[in-house]
From Swiss-Prot:
The keyword Ligase does not apply. Belongs to the universal ribosomal protein uS4 family. One of its GO terms (cellular component) is small ribosomal subunit. SUPFAM superfamilies: Alpha-L RNA-binding motif. This is Small ribosomal subunit protein uS4. Residues 31-54 are annotated as: Disordered. The lineage of its organism: Bacteria, Pseudomonadati, Pseudomonadota, Betaproteobacteria, Burkholderiales. Residues 97-160 form the S4 RNA-binding domain.
Length: 207
């Protein structure tokens, strides 16, 4: 399946919640009506959604949040299932540990899509070395920074300033003056923001 390149707000409206696909400079609630589905008058249905439908919708929502395609997502779930502990939490930790997501969480990109672009364009270093693979898994102690030539980009400075005002996640330590951050550890479930019910995804793949 190809990556979706259409209006991002439409995806959030479809799920009825902010998927954080747009910059936080303006509240998404100011940009569109999250309580109505896409379409001229908002699509409605009197039919109750089945358990399978809810599970499938939750998977689609998480894929859209992290910008992951179906084949990648299946691999992440298989790896999460192999690991010890809660499969759903393992899945979210794997997604949160992606390089593009860590760049976003550290505030170098205003959205995950922008962070992914920075990584692909070789604007990001990991432990001092260029790494242009958005899906690369970041480990505890890894240092993620902005390449010297890219520090002049206005969009990075603006995104970082906004992130400083909002506050960084507890599992990363960011030095905004150096355009650098340390990935301290994989986040606990309570540290992962977003309206996600990962148990529905586990149920879907357990069918």
């Amino acid at each position: 399946m190809a990556r979706y390149i259409g209006p991002k707000a439409k995806l959030s409206r479809r799920e009825g919640t902010d998927l954080f696909l747009k910059s936080a400079r303006r509240s998404l609630a100011d940009k569109c009506k999250l309580d109505s589905k896409p379409g001229q008058h908002g699509r409605t249905s009197g039919a109750r959604t089945s358990d399978y439908g809810n599970q499938l919708r939750e998977k689609q929502k998480v894929k859209r949040i992290y910008g992951v395609l179906e084949r990648q997502f299946r691999r992440y779930f298989a790896e999460a299932d192999r690991r010890k502990g809660n499969t759903g939490e393992n899945l979210l930790q794997l997604l949160e540990s992606r390089l593009d997501n860590v760049v976003y969480r550290m505030g170098f990109g205003s959205t995950r899509a922008e962070a992914r672009q920075l990584v692909s364009h070789k604007a990001i270093l990991v432990n001092g070395e260029t790494l242009n693979v958005p899906s690369a898994q970041i480990k505890s102690g890894d240092i993620v920074s902005v390449r010297e030539q890219s520090k002049k980009q206005v969009r990075i400075a603006e995104a970082l300033s906004l992130a400083e005002q909002s506050g960084f996640p507890t599992w990363v330590a960011v030095d905004a003056k150096k355009f650098e951050g340390t990935y301290k550890q994989a986040p606990d479930r309570a540290d992962i923001s977003g309206d996600i019910n990962e148990s529905l995804i586990v149920e879907l793949y357990s069918r």
